[in-house]
């Protein structure tokens, strides 16, 4: 999934391919075959779903002259025309890439540690490599939003309060959740113990 997403210019396809890579990370926890591995899986999935809600709310709001747009180049200098929206997406992309201190970083850390502790060091190393590759295509989107070429007519300003709310709420969770993951660690640990008993 990580390799397939590299050359994509369609943001929907890019995110679809990246989803394959993210499922791979989640399955590392399952492959560990331990209670901690299940805990890591549950934490990762909760974080990933939250990130995806915001990301796809952003994608669905991408329109030009009232028509849906999927080309990544259409995001050129979005930070200038819609700074709040661009910043929220930047936070989500950094979190998806696993950049510290975003919550997505801790999600990846959990599954990588679970794999390593279970003696699957090769799998953890493969996960780190895939994460580095993934960071490339996520940061490419950030580049377009902040350093791309100027456009005479940018994307339409979203008029959907629901999509905007999902985007902003997801981004805020990725930042604020760093404090204690909203108690997710304890809940996931309890659920994992129940599942292995």
Identify the meaning behind each predicted range.
Residues 1-197:
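Alpha-helical transmembrane segments of multi-pass membrane proteins predominantly involved
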């Amino acid at each position: 999934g990580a390799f397939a997403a590299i050359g994509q210019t369609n943001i929907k396809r890019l995110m679809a391919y990246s989803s394959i890579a993210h499922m791979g990370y989640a399955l590392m926890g399952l492959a560990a075959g331990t209670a901690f591995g299940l805990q890591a899986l549950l934490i990762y999935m909760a974080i990933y779903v939250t990130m995806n809600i915001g990301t796809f709310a952003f994608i669905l709001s991408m329109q030009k002259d009232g028509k849906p747009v999927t080309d990544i180049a259409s995001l050129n200098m979005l930070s200038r025309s819609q700074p709040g929206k661009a910043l929220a997406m930047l936070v989500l992309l950094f979190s998806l890439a696993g950049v510290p201190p975003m919550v997505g970083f801790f999600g990846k850390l959990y599954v990588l540690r679970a794999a390593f502790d279970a003696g699957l060091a090769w799998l953890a190393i493969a996960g780190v490599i895939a994460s580095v590759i993934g960071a490339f295509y996520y940061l490419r989107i950030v580049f377009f939003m902040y350093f791309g070429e100027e456009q005479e007519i940018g994307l339409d300003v979203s008029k959907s309060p629901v999509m905007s709310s999902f985007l902003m709420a997801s981004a805020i969770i990725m930042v604020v959740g760093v404090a204690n993951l909203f108690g997710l660690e304890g809940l996931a640990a309890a659920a994992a113990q129940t599942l292995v008993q």
